[in-house]
């Protein structure tokens, strides 16, 4: 072997040492975040954006995501095409994330970016800011206090849900937080738990239809996307409405992103992500206000700003 082909051998570390390193680091981090300032349920674009903004301001944030991967639907645009769009002024968020983007050839005020670059850039930004990620972990319920104030979440390993019921006597655990953010997308899972108990006014869930999320011999739906809570697609109305309605839905619970549309019965916006990013920013500011954190305000974008050169 020539000198150019040689390399310094890996350190002499065995299997048990690898296992201990993983277990010790995970346990230490999890213990630190078992009682957090903010728990964000859902690691899609709005949840990650809120996590980034809060962590940058010194807020202790844990993101709970049921999938092995973070990012939700931000990896792809519509129809399995991996280009994502944002409408002005949300391209400013892509600038912040140092994500390349360009103006649409045919539409003024519409910008296109590479989905994997945008999504991975947002994940990295949230992690770099100090937000902690608990993936493969499924939200199952909320923790409540007096007057049903939200005080945390109940969660379990995601694979437990897929096991046959007769062998799944696996109790969940609970973690506490001063504030919970529902960023679970179309499902609005935390909001639904309160709605089921009759303690939350969620107009989008009051007359919830049935069958839209079912796929069997007699029905077809797109699970997680044809939510009965939100209205049909209307890009021009939906994005503004989602940002405007982002905020405190119940004492201790902030709603952001598509969970906002489901909660309030707003139209969906399809494969354009500006509202998801800006809604996450707004949710972070609401959280800062609720927690009375003395920090620099979150910069929610404005169309008065000068767009970046492409």
Curated annotation (Swiss-Prot):
It catalyses: [ADP-thiazole synthase]-L-cysteine + glycine + NAD(+) = [ADP-thiazole synthase]-dehydroalanine + ADP-5-ethyl-4-methylthiazole-2-carboxylate + nicotinamide + 3 H2O + 2 H(+). GO terms for molecular function: cysteine-dependent adenosine diphosphate thiazole synthase activity; iron ion binding. NAD(+) binds at residues 46, 65-66, 73, 171, 258. Fe cation binds at residues 171, 186. Glycine binds at residue 268. It is an enzyme of class 2 (transferase). Its EC number is 2.4.2.60. The keyword Iron applies. The modification 2,3-didehydroalanine (Cys) is found at residue 169. Gene3D superfamilies: FAD/NAD(P)-binding domain (3.50.50.60). GO terms for biological process: thiamine biosynthetic process; thiamine diphosphate biosynthetic process; thiazole biosynthetic process. Its cofactor is Fe(2+). Residues 205-219 have a biased composition (Acidic residues). Residues 202-226 are annotated as: Disordered. PANTHER family: THIAMINE THIAZOLE SYNTHASE. Involved in biosynthesis of the thiamine precursor thiazole. Catalyzes the conversion of NAD and glycine to adenosine diphosphate 5-(2-hydroxyethyl)-4-methylthiazole-2-carboxylic acid (ADT), an adenylated thiazole intermediate. The reaction includes an iron-dependent sulfide transfer from a conserved cysteine residue of the protein to a thiazole intermediate. The enzyme can only undergo a single turnover, which suggests it is a suicide enzyme. This is Thiamine thiazole synthase. It comes from Haloarcula marismortui (strain ATCC 43049 / DSM 3752 / JCM 8966 / VKM B-1809). The gene is thi4.
